Regions:
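Solvent-exposed beta-strand/loop surfaces of large extracellular or lumenal domains
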Residues: 53-75, 618-634
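The feature marks proteins involved in alpha-glucan
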Residues: 1-34, 38, 70-174
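Conserved alpha/beta catalytic core and glycan-binding cleft of carbohydrate-active enzymes
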Residues: 120, 352-353, 357-509, 516-520, ...
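C-terminal beta-strand-rich structural cap/linker in extracellular carbohydrate-active enzymes
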Residues: 43, 85-89, 630-651
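Beta-strand-rich binding/interaction modules
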Residues: 41, 47-58, 62, 605-622
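Carbohydrate-binding surface patches
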Residues: 31-47, 567-611
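Glycan-recognition and catalytic regions of carbohydrate-active enzymes
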Residues: 21-26, 493-516, 526-595
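Substrate-binding/active-site clefts of carbohydrate-active enzymes
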Residues: 151-330, 336-359, 365, 377
Length: 651
């Protein structure tokens, strides 16, 4: 008997009988050859299915409608003879819920706004030389992640990027850009190469629904956490969203340019929900891909009206297929999972195992937000912070414990953290240094599971937070010396801590959003990187640059083994000072035999006694590049500057 209510459909979809009858692991989507194209769609609840063909990605009449043939396991298919490159299509499906048109869930490109899917020959679409693109080899000691939105990266008129490329994938390909083309102050890719970051994390680049690709972008803006087509690049980031091949080619050009600069690409993926409940997955198989409450209603742990049912077999397959597609086809170097707590542990571990099977796959990063956006109907083990020890040791999490310990809670603008003088927070600073491997609050397998950070796209920028803690009516555009020192101290803590360091683009030049804590659809002007600030705060940029280099020169800070956090020796200092020593690992090429690090969050100088031996001053609260020259050798007592992270190397 056919189900009649959402609750009955939930019972059916979660039954072993349905899984046996419909689990399918053959090809889906487009299988193109010049001689002909196979189309395959998994739609087990459909009663009829047809494909509609178009010459254009938007507008124009349908040039043919052909019935699909029903196969085993809920698959519908058709073979289209002849070269179909450049054709667009959608499906007309009749299910117990009615008749509708649907794009292909496995579409690899699309027309405007992702409504029509596209058939294309990858060999004719790939940029020149794509077959020679390779992922850069980035050892753990050099890993650091810089998070940016494609629009924000180059939207500033002073970015030096060609006007037509601003806010686009192609902005990442332009070489030698400088501030207002002055030939002096680097911007965009030129800036990243000088800064020394090893990975760029791109906020969502797959097709999202909150920006209308058919309209000018002047007043449109959204971060893109509202997916429409999971395997299709976003059209508004391309130079021509009407032609599906352009978004594919230009996305790959961006990735190739970053790889050529030695920078890996981390993709921010948002499989946990879709833009609307009426979406490509729900049209193909109504209700199947989305988690349901006991009464059959859609669970809303994402806070966006729906959440992906990763525990259902074909939904799990879809997620894994999609990630593997981006890894193989686009040479993606890492994946950041939005609201990872909405996925089950089993799915995440299976995905990690599948990535590991790819050539170089064990080096592909995988991490996510270990929380949810609301109450979820997921009743298996969630991939969240509480279950960290159930996840593969190479699946990491954003450590909000570290974030809040350093700068204060993110939900209360006035709540201070360690760098602003919060009493008692030094305990969590010590735990952060050891990537929480020596704390009972978190159960990581190894330090590599911890993302050490203080700012990301969510919540206040670090600069805004520092000013809002200190002042009732902050002047965000002002050059505040205390906030600058606190900013340097915050960076000095997480960039000398174990784990994977991560920061929001522009944190290193005091990025401000004028106190706006959730700018996901604010103006492009508020969100874009202000490249003038990179020049104005060049000394802060240089401080980050020096710490990145210092960290790479002492590989044990990026160690992935649990023995390394255990080797940290913490000093018994007067609160709130924190001090520690870490010996280098034999044979790792470290520039110094040990590091000795002190954090002083007070606004007065402090005197400490160094461990025995001779110590070279590598970094203090003003300069983090002393290690590059012949800085002074210290023994015995030394003075820590106010609001400073001070680093010594044993010689």
């Amino acid at each position: 008997m056919e189900p009649r209510t959402p609750a009955e459909w939930k019972t059916l979809f979660e039954s072993e009988a349905f899984a046996r009858q419909t689990e399918y692991y053959g090809p889906l989507g487009v299988e193109y050859t010049p001689a002909g194209t196979h189309l395959r769609l998994w739609a087990p609840t459909a009663k009829q299915a047809a494909v509609n063909l178009y010459r254009r990605g938007t507008g124009g009449a349908c040039v043919g409608t052909l019935p699909l043939q029903q196969q085993d396991k809920g698959v519908w298919s058709i073979y289209l003879p002849g070269d179909q490159h450049g054709k667009y299509y959608d499906f007309t499906l009749t299910t117990p819920f009615g008749t509708c048109n649907a794009a292909d869930p496995y579409a690899r490109s699309a027309g405007v706004n992702g409504v029509r899917s596209m058939i294309f020959d990858p060999a004719r679409v790939d940029p020149q030389g794509w077959e020679r693109d390779v992922r850069p080899v980035i050892p753990p000691a050099r890993r650091s992640v810089w998070e940016v939105n494609v629009r924000d990266f180059s939207q500033d008129p002073a970015s030096g990027v060609h006007t037509a490329w601003r806010g686009k994938f192609l902005a990442f390909t332009q070489q030698g850009t400088t501030l207002s083309s002055d030939g002096i102050h680097p911007t965009c890719l030129n800036y990243l190469k000088r800064l020394g970051v090893s990975y760029v994390q791109l906020m969502p680049i797959f097709d999202f629904g909150s920006v209308d690709e058919s309209r000018p972008l002047t007043r449109q803006y959204n971060w893109g956490y509202d997916p429409t087509n999971f395997n299709v690049p976003e059209g508004s980031y391309s130079s021509d969203p009407t032609r599906g091949e352009v978004r594919v080619r230009e996305c790959k050009q961006m990735i190739a340019a970053l790889h050529a600069a030695g920078i890996g690409v981390v993709m921010d993926v948002v499989y946990n929900h879709m833009y609307r409940s009426d979406n490509v997955l729900n049209r193909a198989v109504p209700l199947y891909y989305f988690r349901q409450n006991a009464d059959g209603s859609l669970s809303n742990g994402s806070g966006c009206g729906n959440e992906f049912a990763s525990e259902r077999p074909m939904a799990r397959r879809y997620l894994i297929d999609s990630v593997l597609y981006w890894a193989r086809e686009y040479h993606i170097d890492g994946f950041r999972f939005d609201l990872m707590g909405l996925y089950d542990v089993e799915t995440m571990n299976l995905l990690r195992a599948e990535l590991d099977k790819l050539p170089g796959g064990r080096d592909i990063l995988m991490y996510g937000e270990p929380w949810q956006g609301g109450c979820s109907a997921l009743h298996r083990y969630e991939a969240n912070k509480n279950n960290l020890n159930m996840l593969n040791e190479r699946i990491g999490i954003f450590c909000d414990n570290t974030r809040d310990a350093i700068k204060g809670g993110c939900f209360d603008a006035r709540e201070p953290g360690y760098v602003e003088g919060r009493p008692g927070s030094f305990w969590d600073i010590g735990a952060s240094v050891a990537a929480w491997c020596r704390s009972e609050k978190l159960p990581p397998h190894a330090p590599g599971q911890i993302i050490s950070y203080v700012s990301a796209h969510d919540n206040f920028t670090l600069w805004d937070k520092l000013l809002m803690v200190r002042y009732a009516r902050p002047e965000f555009a002002a050059v505040d010396k205390t906030a600058l020192a606190q900013n340097r101290l915050a960076a000095g803590i997480y960039l000398t801590s174990m784990g994977l360091p991560f920061w929001q683009a522009g944190e290193e030049f005091a990025r401000t959003k004028k106190g706006q804590g959730n700018s996901y659809r604010s103006s492009p002007a508020l969100n874009r990187l202000d490249w003038h600030r990179a020049e104005q705060f060049h000394s802060l940029v240089d401080y980050y640059r020096g710490l990145i280099g210092l960290r790479a020169a002492f590989p044990r800070l990026g160690a992935l083994d649990k023995a390394s956090p255990a080797a940290i020796e913490f000093f018994p200092l007067e609160q709130p000072l924190v001090g520690w020593r870490l010996p280098a690992q034999w044979g790792d090429g470290a520039a110094w035999s040990a590091l000795c690090v002190y954090y002083n969050p007070t606004e007065t100088a402090q005197v400490v006694t160094l461990p025995g031996g001779s110590w070279k001053l590598l970094s203090d609260g003003i300069s983090s590049s002393l290690w590059r020259g012949s800085s002074r050798i210290c023994t015995g007592q030394t003075v820590l500057l106010p609001l400073s992270a001070t680093v010594f190397g044993q010689v």
